[in-house]
């Protein structure tokens, strides 16, 4: 295999065999793949009993007004954590990410700092987060190796939530 991509990592999840590896530790802008770390933080909070799927969070003006992909939440409405998770996974909702970030850490900025700290603790060495959505920022980066590591950790450590990733639509 070969690729013109700056960085790439393809692994056979059944055998663990590396099929393609190119500059896998190079930090790059991860865009919406950052949302995997947002979900990790939410899943961890759920498992620790800090929040529950049926808890509701209020949509802030910031979340409502965020551009890009969204769940189309309305400012001031309350949404369950379960529906916010679906909004992140199925609709790649920037608004849903921000509501979750604010609900867990007070502000998205605080949440991004916690994301970076936790990422290092779980072995993501090339990751730095400035927001919960992957919105472009020169300091917001992840490597291919970190992305695969995180995806595998979510699959292994939070199997009870993994079925949501199979859903194709959400209304």
Predicted features, each with a name:
Residues 1-145, 152-156:
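Active-site-adjacent loops and short helices of periplasmic peptidoglycan-processing enzymes
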Residues 146-171:
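Extracytoplasmic
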């Amino acid at each position: 295999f070969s690729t013109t991509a700056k960085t790439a990592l393809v692994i056979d999840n059944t055998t663990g065999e590396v099929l393609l590896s190119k500059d896998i530790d190079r930090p790059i802008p991860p865009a919406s793949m950052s949302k995997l770390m947002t979900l990790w933080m939410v899943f961890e909070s759920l498992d620790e009993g800090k929040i529950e799927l049926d808890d509701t969070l209020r949509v802030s003006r910031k979340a409502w007004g965020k551009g890009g992909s969204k769940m189309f939440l309305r400012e001031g409405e309350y949404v369950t954590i379960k529906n916010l998770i679906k909004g992140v996974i199925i609709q790649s909702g920037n608004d849903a990410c921000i509501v979750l970030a604010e609900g867990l850490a007070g502000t998205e900025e605080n949440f991004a700092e916690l994301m970076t700290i936790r990422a290092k603790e779980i072995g993501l060495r090339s990751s730095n987060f400035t927001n919960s959505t992957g919105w472009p920022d020169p300091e917001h980066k992840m490597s291919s190796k970190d992305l695969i590591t995180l995806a595998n950790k979510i699959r292994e450590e939070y199997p009870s939530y993994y079925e949501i990733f199979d859903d194709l639509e959400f209304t």
